[in-house]
Amino acid sequence: MTVARTHQGQAPPGLFDESAGRGTAVAVVTDEAEYTYSALSRMSAERAAEYPPVTTGRRLIGLVATNTIEFLVDYLAAHSAGHVVLLLPPDGAATDNLLAAWHPDVVAGDGRPLPAGVLTAPPRHDLHPDLALLLSTSGSTGAPKLVRQSRRAVLANARSIVDYLGIVPGDRAITTLPPHYCYGLSVLHSHLLDGASVVLNSDSVSAPAFWD
């Protein structure tokens, strides 16, 4: 993947760097706990510090996308650290195809420590300074193809959803699709952008557990 070399030493702003200012408002709900915006920001900042410094070049971060707090923290952290995110489906075969095609510098998403050598290995790609996110197309034939999105495009899409649906800080949405689908990801983007909250759920709407 070669588009244009990023400006070394200049980390682009994260997607939701202002979220820490929302303090004790609830951002995320899981089966085990509630996480405030302040806690989510702190967890993301701590995780971001584990990624390679952007002064040595932006990396392509492959994240296995699941509706878990571990993934969400990794996702926000990778953006906050100034890197580019490639979302990977949790399905083994599909993930293997994307890894073989695009060779991310780091694969994460489950909150576990990053592999040894990540901080010292040079970047594998020249990444455009505006690039923030890569989403796989839904086509089932041919080589995997990616849709490129800038930070501006991601935020503009989230803002348009907020305005259209009238999302306000008191709203709470439950996840019904995994975040490697653009719709599933848009639920996270739109609600976190406007100070609302999300309930992280991995069950489909047809599963009895979804309604419990």
Model-inferred region functions:
Residues 8, 24-55, 96, 152:
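Conserved AMP-binding/adenylate-forming core of the ANL superfamily
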Residues 14-18, 69-87, 161-163, 182-194:
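Hydrophobic alpha-helical segments in the ANL/AMP-binding
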Residues 33, 49-91, 176-178:
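Conserved AMP-binding/adenylate-forming
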Residues 36-38, 131-159:
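Conserved AMP-binding A3 loop
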Residues 158-172, 182-212:
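Conserved AMP-binding/adenylation subdomain of ANL enzymes
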